[in-house]
Amino acid sequence: MNAKDFNLEAVQDACNEAAMQARTAAKIAYVQIGERDACGFAWVNVYGVRSNSKLGKALQSFGFRKDYTGSLQLWNPSGHNTQSISVKEAGAYAYAEVLKNKLGLEKVYAGSRMD
């Protein structure tokens, strides 16, 4: 998606669906894994979107923040309260996939690190 074909409703729909998919993926992973995994964090990075653009401002309204790499980043997109890194990664991957498919953004990646 670029500035020419920016559509606020499409961004809102994509972010809402991505959040729902992330929560669902995290719940499924939690049922399978539970708390018996390494502790960690997960997030989604969106590269190539300026934070002062319409798209950037729309993403920021859904919790994205500019990080040190210049990307827009959303921590724990599933909102799951577990410490299990695998559960949080499942949510982050699901969120990133929806943004790629719904908004046509190419540089959307899930990331994680152990605590």
Predicted regions and their residues:
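Short, compact, well-ordered microdomains
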Residues: 75-115
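Detector for the mature cores of small, proteolytically processed
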Residues: 55-78, 98
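A generic structural signal for short, non-catalytic loop/turn and secondary-structure boundary residues
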Residues: 37-39, 67, 103
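N-terminal leader/targeting segments
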Residues: 1-61
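Ordered hydrophobic segments in well-structured contexts
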Residues: 43-45, 73, 109
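Sequence-level detector for tyrosine residue identity
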Residues: 30, 47, 68, 93-95, ...
